[in-house]
């Protein structure tokens, strides 16, 4: 049996969809939703605002929800390595998730370990996955 301690929930209160779309009454909804997640025993949350600037979207939300979400918080897909380290060191994120960066850089770990620059993701890179 898979328990709530083995489940991570991913939510997207902001998205790039022909421009930035943000959930109406975002903070009120998130506060209620996260309290319910907590009551269910969920302890891992991935806050994704895919294809948008972290500091303009999920970074702002993360700073607010830390007050009522004391559990594992994951996010930051658009962050650089240095920005990600800073968000973790400041206690805003527990883990950083990179998807597009890994697709663009199959040798992601090696590049990060050596401090080498990462290629920018381009939507055409998705074609090689099919």
Where are these regions (language model features)?
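Flavin-dependent oxidoreductase catalytic cores
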Residues: 1-130
